[in-house]
From Swiss-Prot:
Belongs to the ficolin lectin family. Veficolin subfamily. SMART domains: FBG. This is Ryncolin-1. It is found in: Secreted. One of its GO terms (biological process) is complement activation, lectin pathway. GO terms for molecular function: antigen binding; carbohydrate derivative binding; signaling receptor binding; toxin activity. Its main location: secreted. The keyword Signal applies. Disulfide bonds join C130-C158, C282-C295. Initiates complement activation and/or interferes in platelet aggregation and/or blood coagulation.
Length: 345
């Protein structure tokens, strides 16, 4: 059926029914009951019949997108992932401050006895002096460790060349680089430089000369290169309580006359400890430290002058040598255990 034919059919039926309703309404008072018995919409005075669906229309134009919705709440935390590989180790940080010193630990067990010494330069504690070193094959001048007693190791200079070697040097002057006009405590402990001038120390000299007889040799050299020496049969000094009192034996021989034995029996004096027999302080008058009496014939710890000097007797003087107005360029004093035979040089 054509769409327009259906339209006309509906229109005719509707018009017919409307006429009936109107006639009944004018001819009596009986209510009008609907005559529709379909599931479609109806009223008391109209019946609308639905025809077949028409052809769908053309789709409309799509609408515009709506605005972005609000961000949702975070979801629940997921389970931990697997551990990743170790990263590259970073650079070391700066060194921290030194911590407090820890408590002292317990004393360890006593170690096993060591093996016998077989290394070069390894010397037994029986090496008491430079002569012992020479007998152990040490033939070079230099500083060595000796053991006058096992409890008292000592570093000393050994002259291994002069007069057969084995001499222990306890005093040396050679260039004026060290001040010898010092006090009692300095001479007690020792001072100076290993490579140049030094005084070994009265306490050490006492220890070295307190057992066995030690010969003494004094060597001098002037600024013209002339060398002289004097040798004595024995030499020792007392301890500090004895004021380091000098005990020197007989003059044996030498290329210069004796100017030292006259000091025998006298105490050691310094500028701050006057132990001489003079009314004044000989150490202060003659700018040294020595076994002064009233005052001296030798002053090997005096001021370092270069040869002749104007001041009286305050240089490195030797009365029977160059006298009181000439100071020597080089001086040393050294000891060696007494020997039955000695070689003079």
């Amino acid at each position: 059926m054509k769409p327009w034919a259906a339209f006309h059919l509906i229109f005719l039926v509707a018009s017919s029914l409307e006429g009936e309703v109107s006639n009944y309404g004018t001819g009596g008072t009986q209510d009008t009951e609907p005559t529709c018995r379909t599931e479609h919409q109806c009223t008391r005075d109209k019946i609308i019949l639905q025809s077949q669906p028409g052809i769908p229309g053309i789709p409309g134009v799509p609408g515009t997108n709506g605005s972005e919705g609000l961000k949702g709440d975070p979801g629940p935390q997921g389970p931990p992932g697997i551990r990743g590989p170790d990263g590259i180790r970073g650079e070391a940080g700066p060194k921290g401050d030194k911590g407090d010193q820890g408590d002292k630990g317990d004393k360890g067990d006593k170690g096993d006895k060591g093996e016998d010494c077989n290394l070069d330069g390894c010397l037994p504690t029986e090496v008491r002096n430079c002569q012992d070193l020479l007998e152990h094959g040490e033939i070079l001048n230099g500083w060595y460790t000796i053991y006058p007693t096992k409890e008292n190791p000592m570093v000393v200079f050994c002259d291994m060349e002069t007069d057969g070697g084995g001499w222990l040097v306890f005093q040396r002057r050679q260039d004026g680089s060290v001040d010898f006009y010092l006090d009692w405590e300095s001479y007690k402990k020792g001072f100076g430089k290993q490579e140049s001038e030094f005084w070994l120390g009265n306490d050490k000299i006492h220890l070295l000369t307190s057992s066995g007889t030690q010969q003494l040799r004094i060597d001098l050299e002037d600024f013209e290169g002339s060398r002289t020496f004097a040798k004595y049969s024995s030499f020792s000094i007392g301890d500090e309580n004895e004021k380091y009192r000098l005990i020197v034996g007989s003059y044996l021989d030498g290329s210069m006359n004796d100017s030292f034995r006259i000091h025998n029996g006298h105490s050691f004096s310094t500028k701050d400890r006057d132990n001489d027999t003079n009314k004044g302080n000989c150490a202060m008058m003659y700018k040294g430290a020595w076994w002064y009496f009233h005052c001296h014939h030798a002053n090997l710890n005096g001021l370092y002058y270069k040869g002749k000097h104007a001041n009286y007797a305050d240089g490195i003087n030797w009365r029977s040598g160059k006298g009181y107005y000439y100071s020597y360029k080089y001086a040393d004093m050294k000891i060696r255990p007494q020997q039955s035979e000695t070689t003079v040089s």
